């Protein structure tokens, strides 16, 4: 889990738009966040395996 102070700091409006970054809405992780789902890769994988993300299936070819 992310530090509470870092999550609070990120939620405030930044002075410059360049400083804004995505953060996982579930755990607060700042890296490897899928914008479409607003989830990090770890949370995305957990929820996808449980079938809680509609339209997402495990690939097989």
From Swiss-Prot:
Binds 1 zinc ion per subunit. Zn(2+) binds at residues 24, 27, 40, 43. Gene3D superfamilies: 30s Ribosomal Protein S14, Chain N. Keywords: Metal-binding, Ribonucleoprotein, Ribosomal protein, RNA-binding, rRNA-binding, Zinc. One of its GO terms (biological process) is translation. GO terms for cellular component: small ribosomal subunit. One of its GO terms (molecular function) is rRNA binding. Its cofactor is Zn(2+). InterPro entries: Ribosomal_uS14, Ribosomal_uS14_bact, Ribosomal_uS14_CS, Ribosomal_uS14_sf. Belongs to the universal ribosomal protein uS14 family. Zinc-binding uS14 subfamily. Part of the 30S ribosomal subunit. Contacts proteins S3 and S10. Binds 16S rRNA, required for the assembly of 30S particles and may also be responsible for determining the conformation of the 16S rRNA at the A site. This is Small ribosomal subunit protein uS14B. It comes from Staphylococcus epidermidis (strain ATCC 35984 / DSM 28319 / BCRC 17069 / CCUG 31568 / BM 3577 / RP62A). The lineage of its organism: Bacteria, Bacillati, Bacillota, Bacilli, Bacillales. The gene is rpsZ.
